[in-house]
Regions:
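ABC-type nucleotide-binding domain
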Residues: 4-280
Length: 280
């Protein structure tokens, strides 16, 4: 972890040096110190409200570190997506602290913070351009070889190779000619080429058939390797291999543990599991 004294820095920036992410801490004498970015994320008694009269999150505490997969489950409106929005600093919290590698995220430039976070959404954002260009959007200076390698790791290379012009096939608009699964594979490849230390997977496999989900899940597994990963999903297969599962209800974490521990408790998670995860 970065020494706690770093929180007093007025400016903390993330940068990439020779393929490694690092924090750059400026000092009063004009020098800087580089500290490798790890991806430790801590929520410390966090409260949050979109409006003053309605609190959304209550006393949220959690810790996630590289190599860990932390999943959030619960009914719609429980606060799952709100937590990931706070990691991105789309909103500032009302009380408590969020730390990233020991640094209060309020001390980190928003652009730098978000550059170190990869996101895979259910509604994949593709644009008019080639497949290569869409994947490269995750890292604009990526070489063709890096893009292709990312697609291979994401399990997208096979379907891309079957397209009329492969990686040079042009997608129109939102790439409606591709299946939902193919669109998600491109989104995974884009996140893979970005090679960020923290990954957020939001509803990433909830609208595809079971067969396609297996292909996407394989790409997801490669993407999550060695990273700090936060997952929000509808399907139990997406979360049951998580290191920690946070069961949320009305903005609170009411249960936490791994799949086996929560099943043994026979609480809310057990109800969701036996009910085919319909509420998650």
């Amino acid at each position: 972890l970065v020494n706690a004294s770093c929180e007093n820095d007025k400016l903390v920036e993330s940068e990439v040096r020779t393929g490694l992410w690092a924090w750059k801490h400026p000092h009063h004498d004009g020098t800087t110190t580089l500290t490798q970015l790890k991806g430790d994320v801590v929520f410390d008694h966090v409260d949050f409200s979109y409006t003053p009269d309605k609190q959304i999150l209550h006393d949220i505490s959690l810790y996630a570190k590289p190599g860990q997969k932390v999943a959030f489950v619960g009914a719609t409106g429980a606060g799952k997506t709100t937590i990931t929005n706070l990691i991105n600093r789309f909103y500032d919290i009302a009380d408590g602290k969020i730390r990233y590698d020991g640094i209060n995220i309020n001390k980190i430039k928003k652009a730098d913070l978000r550059r170190s976070l990869g996101i895979v959404l259910q509604d994949t954002n593709l644009f008019t351009g080639t497949v290569m260009e869409n994947i490269r959007y995750g890292k604009l200076d990526a070489t063709d070889e890096e893009v292709i390698e990312a697609a291979k790791r994401a399990n997208a290379h096979y379907f891309i190779s079957l397209l009329p012009e492969g990686y040079h096939t042009k997608l129109e608009g939102d790439a409606s000619g591709l299946s939902q699964g193919q669109r998600q594979l491109l989104s995974i490849a884009r996140a893979e080429v970005a090679d960020t230390p923290v990954m957020i997977l939001d509803e990433a496999t909830s609208s595809i058939d079971t067969r396609t989900e297996a292909i996407v899940s394989k790409g997801m597994d490669a993407l999550m390797e060695g990273r700090t990963v936060f997952v929000i999903a509808h399907r139990i297969s997406t979360v049951q291999n998580s290191n920690a599962i946070m069961v949320m209800d009305q903005g609170r974490i009411i249960e936490r543990g791994d799949h086996d521990e929560l099943i043994a408790e026979k609480g809310k998670y057990h109800q969701l599991y036996t009910g085919a995860f319909e509420e998650a």
